[in-house]
Amino acid sequence: MAPKSCQESEDKQVSPAPAGVQPDSSDLGSPVGTPVDRVAPSYSQSAKLYTSTPMGCSVKQQLAPETLDPRTLRLLWEQRELEIQALRWAVQNGHNARYSSILQEVAGVPSERNSKSQDKFLRNQVQKLTLELKAQKEQAQQEKQQLEEKLQQNLWAKQQLEAELQTFQKSCLLQLARSSWVGRVLRSQTGSVEVVTTEVLRDPSDFSESAEIPTSGEGFPLEDVDWNSIAQRYPNLFSNLNFYSDQKQSQPPTSETYTLDSEGATKHTEKPTKILEWSALPLLDTSSSERTQSDTSSCPIALHSGAKKTTGHPSQGTNLASSEQMQEHTRSFSGYTEDLCKSHSPSCSKTVLESYTDLHHPYTRPQLNPFGCCLKIAAVSHREKFIRVINQSQAETIDLGGFVLQQLVRDFPVCMYRFPPGTLLAPQHHITVWGEGTSRTKKQLPVASGQDPFQFQSSRGCVTVLVNPQGQVLSEHQATPCVTLGSKIFTDNTDWSIDCFPLSESEPDVHPGEQQCRPSSPQKGRAKDAGARRKKPGPGVRQHRHSSTSGLRASRTLHPTETRDILPLLSSRKLLPSGEVLTQQEGVKAETSELLPVIPECPSRLCLGEDSLGRQEYKVQVCRKSVDLSCPMVALSVQNTAESRYGFRFLCYPPITEELCRRL
């Protein structure tokens, strides 16, 4: 009965509104444009309507809306639309928070937070971030612990590697000491030479315990060696270890004993500025290191540093050098360094002197830069003692600060100059470094007392190099050897002659009157000859200008008949009377092109002492084709490059020809 009464009462309330007509605003609520005060009654009436309706009827309508007729459903739908519009209007105006919240929930719009909800939201966010930060801290702490553990492991591994490296260095040093300490040469900047032996490695306090050295093993224990003092004394000790690392031992090393000599260890003078460099000796056999006491007569190094005695037994299985390879090459200390090398044979073991195969000196010469450089040593003056460096670059200015000019003699530095910092060399410019007390045009600076003047070397065997701070050779200059050529001296088209006068002791049978005709000195004879040439020559006589080389070449092709009437240029006039000279001048052929000397071997030559009356006189032999070293003579040489104050010309150096040592 209840559902029916409920339906009837609802029809009574809704029936006054016809179909398609909007219900009254007092019953259904105010439209969008109505004032706000009329919304509340409609809401209260609708609330009363819903509250007055029994619960069972409303639940039935919600659960079974199909039971309602279409007209009623349409009215309810329109009513709900009006309510939604009213709620939207209320939310937009903001006068009713409840309407706004309902509209936000219905329309799906996020609700606006107030101050309390905002604080709560922020607190939640802070708590969330705090938890995340705490988790990140825990993770970072774990990673830190893992990294610390890895660091400890790496440090331990590093210590192990350092220990192994130190052990390896000690073993290498022992191998060096066992194989090549005897004869190891140290050369310092001052030129001093020291020979290092195994005694140098030992501390002076350890010599009292020399009796306790074991007779087997490496020769002396590692704990007896002061490695720090060795490193300070020889800083370049381990720099040449790669030289010995390539040589593998084919046989196990035999047991050896190092016996220290009673003469004592080598004395060392330690200086702070002393730089020592190692010289690498070519090892013929690293598996055995037998040594005998060197002979002091054939080994000057042993005299310098004291004889060092070592004993050992040669290896029977090694035959690296034969007896023909055991040679002695003695060198002076000023030029070359004597180096001791061992040559082993199956029958004997000797310490001999051998020269270097790769290194000729302990000083290792820097290598030339293969890429080249724009810097070049333009000139090295041996007379003025200066070095000139030019910058061949077109646009690059080079800083020469720290660059070194070195002069090497036999690959050993004898002179060195370092450019000061800030020395700039512009492109296409040069810089000249002068030595002290050498130039005649430069003003000399006073030299401090007790200090040697700085001078560059001028020997022809000196090599000048320019080295950068990294040790690379940028330029190299060496004077070309000067070869004296006899043909180059007499190419100035001047009258040249070598006047030969046999000395008095070589001709004891010469007539006294003829000796009076000879000139008293070469100077007078040359002066007379010069005066005679200024006069007008007689008929049929020509003055010829020739050179020594042309005369020598022509003398080889002439026939004996052509040299019959050829007279000497100067000696014939001095030794023969004036009448005979005129007779000979008339007999000279006019077609003679060159004046050549008389060849003594020619049987048909003209007798110089035979005049028109048939009288036989002394024959003067003038030899110009070759120098007769068995005949005492006085020779005068002439050229136009120099002249004395007496008007006498002389050569700056003797003429050297290829026929000097040949006898024709």
Curated annotation (Swiss-Prot):
The keyword Coiled coil applies. One of its GO terms (biological process) is positive regulation of mRNA splicing, via spliceosome. Residues 362-481 form the LTD domain. Residues 286-298 have a biased composition (Low complexity). Residues 1-40, 245-272, 286-329, 504-563 are annotated as: Disordered. Residues 245-260, 312-325 have a biased composition (Polar residues). Keywords: Coiled coil. It comes from the Eukaryota. Residues 533-547 have a biased composition (Basic residues). Residues 118-169 form a coiled coil. InterPro entries: Lamin_tail_dom (IPR001322), Lamin_tail_dom_sf (IPR036415), Lamin_tail_domain (IPR052877). This is Lamin tail domain-containing protein 2. The gene is Lmntd2.
